[in-house]
Amino acid sequence: AQAKADWAHVANRHFADTAYLQVAGEPWVGVFGPIELETPAEWAEVAPAGRVHAIWGEAAEVGPEAGEFAWVWGGGGVDHVAAVAAFSQAAPGRTGVAYPGFKDYYAQGGWGDGLGWEIAHDAGQTFSTLLDVAATSPDLAALQIATWNDFGEGTMVEPTHEFGFTYLTALQDFTGVAYGLPE
């Protein structure tokens, strides 16, 4: 019952807002999991079919019409760029991802033993490469920039002392906006 009430609240308060992301005329709703609702039957009671996008590999828990979005992953010896490219080009309507790198901060931050893997920033090349993957994946519904300002995980796009405006200027180049760093 709470999930239904939460969905109704978000739908009534945010979906009609012109600033809310729409994909193919529908509000885009991402679920980092799912964690609480884990079957298509549970999701069918909460959200209209096709409205929910689960993190990659979890869409079956939401239902056959669920969308998917890619996320930062580099564990198990996975080539993260190849994984993002394969996901982004496998089926239309998916949401791709670009991120600057990843730092396994969990043990240092006091959250267990950590993940045991990291993705190098390579002076901005990781982010640029993933933007290139998105540019060559014409059937993506959207591109998510992960995560904007997660300084612990090193996935920040916001300017820093270490990287300056590297990621923002790369994003400006990618989107083709008419302004640059001076503005």
Give residue ranges: language-model regions:
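Glycan-processing catalytic domains of CAZymes
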Residues: 1-183
